[in-house]
Amino acid sequence: MDIKSEVLKIIDELFMEDVSDMMDEDLFDAGVLDSMGTVELIVELENHFDITVPVSEFGRDDWNTANKIIEGITELRNA
């Protein structure tokens, strides 16, 4: 499974929301993510992809869409 599919599956499982048709929509504005959900998502992404997401790199505007989350995970895995 590729990173995109895995991230979409994690978001769907955590928040019971299929975001595959809203890849560039702000997930906070859409009600998918909130502050607690963000923490849950970070923990799940770190565990699943065996990465560490530095707090300095997880700003709301930096990871607020599915595409930005996928891009961030890809960059961290390639670092």
From Swiss-Prot:
Pathway(s) of this molecule: Cell wall biogenesis; lipoteichoic acid biosynthesis
Sites of O-(pantetheine 4'-phosphoryl)serine modification: 35
SUPFAM superfamilies in the record: ACP-like
Biological role: Carrier protein involved in the D-alanylation of lipoteichoic acid (LTA). The loading of thioester-linked D-alanine onto DltC is catalyzed by D-alanine--D-alanyl carrier protein ligase DltA. The DltC-carried D-alanyl group is further transferred to cell membrane phosphatidylglycerol (PG) by forming an ester bond, probably catalyzed by DltD. D-alanylation of LTA plays an important role in modulating the properties of the cell wall in Gram-positive bacteria, influencing the net charge of the cell wall.
Compartments reported by the entry: Cytoplasm
Family under the similarity heading: Belongs to the DltC family.
Taxonomic lineage: Bacteria, Bacillati, Bacillota, Bacilli, Lactobacillales
Organism: Streptococcus mutans serotype c (strain ATCC 700610 / UA159)
Domain of life, source organism: Bacteria
Stored PROSITE patterns: CARRIER
Record flagged with keyword Lyase: no
Residue ranges occupied by any Carrier domain in the UniProt entry: 1-77
UniProt KW Membrane keyword: no
Pfam annotation, one family: PP-binding
GO biological process, any: lipoteichoic acid biosynthetic process
Processing after translation: 4'-phosphopantetheine is transferred from CoA to a specific serine of apo-DCP.
Protein name: D-alanyl carrier protein
InterPro entries in UniProt: ACP-like_sf, DltC, PP-bd_ACP
Keyword line: Cell wall biogenesis/degradation, Cytoplasm, Phosphopantetheine, Phosphoprotein
CC per GO annotation: cytoplasm
